[in-house]
Amino acid sequence: MELEQREGTMAAVGFEEFSAPPGSELALPPLFGGHILESELETEVEFVSGGLGGSGLRERDEEEEAARGRRRRQRELNRRKYQALGRRCREIEQVNERVLNRLHQVQRITRRLQQERRFLMRVLDSYGDDYRSSQFTIVLEDEGSQGTDAPTPGNAENEPPDKEGLSPPRRTPAPPEPGSPAPGEGPSGRKRRRAPRDTRRVGAALTPELAPIKVEEDFGFEADEALDSSWVSRGPDKLLPYPTLASPPFD
């Protein structure tokens, strides 16, 4: 009995000496000034806050991915637009080149017609023709039958520079040769069909106005000028007589 009472007293004394209520001065001091527990608590709080905000991170990632997809689609759309614009620009450049070539061709045709008209006016003036006071009848042709080289009536560029009120002369095909048979005449008496040819070349070959007409002033020699020795060596019997030109005496 005594032994049990003594052990109980020692246990009671030991408990009272080494145990103390919370908040008393006998409590052991925290390690490192108690900062370890505070840092652990802060880490736990940060981890908890990060775990609670996981849905926000996912939403932000989804928004960034959607923005990248929109930018990628916009770049692809811009690339297609640039390619379409490049093709359209090349087509327009080709059309402009063709139009420019056609413009140069029309300018050459216009200059040729003006030169022919001036030459014709000079020839008519040299013959004393009163063509300025005459009346011209202009026959309007259909667009399908009108040639590309035919001048347009009333065009200011085709009119002579110093002559006012002068209409473009009518172009008439050259008369057929006397020896050639008529289209309806022949062994069979039927018309011959020919393959269609280029109207521009045919018109240029049939219209005598397109070929330049030479006059005496265009040859550049005088009437009393001596002929070359090659002409003299042929003899007078082989030379054609020219009554308007004075031939030099033969030795």
UniProtKB/Swiss-Prot annotation:
GO BP, one annotated term: DNA repair
InterPro entries, sorted: INO80F, TFPT
Cross-link Glycyl lysine isopeptide (Lys-Gly) (interchain with G-Cter in SUMO2), sequence positions: K214
Key words of the record: Apoptosis, DNA damage, DNA recombination, DNA repair, Isopeptide bond, Nucleus, Phosphoprotein, Transcription, Transcription regulation, Ubl conjugation
Molecular-function GO terms, alphabetical: DNA binding; protein kinase binding
Biased composition regions of type Pro residues, renumbered to the chain: 170-181
Highest taxon in the source lineage: Eukaryota
Localisation: Nucleus
GO cellular component: cytoplasm; Ino80 complex; nucleoplasm; nucleus
Signal peptide: none
Location of Phosphoserine modifications: S167, S180, S188, S247
In-chain residues carrying the UniProt-annotated modification Phosphothreonine: T172, T207
Aminoacyl-tRNA synthetase in keyword set: no
Record region (Disordered): 50-72, 142-213, 228-251
Quaternary context: Interacts with NOL3; translocates NOL3 into the nucleus and negatively regulated TFPT-induced cell death. Component of the chromatin remodeling INO80 complex; specifically part of a complex module associated with the N-terminus of INO80.
PANTHER family on file: TCF3 FUSION PARTNER (PTHR35084:SF1)
Function according to Swiss-Prot or TrEMBL: Appears to promote apoptosis in a p53/TP53-independent manner. Putative regulatory component of the chromatin remodeling INO80 complex which is involved in transcriptional regulation, DNA replication and probably DNA repair.
Protein name per UniProt: TCF3 fusion partner homolog
Native source organism of the sequence: Bos taurus
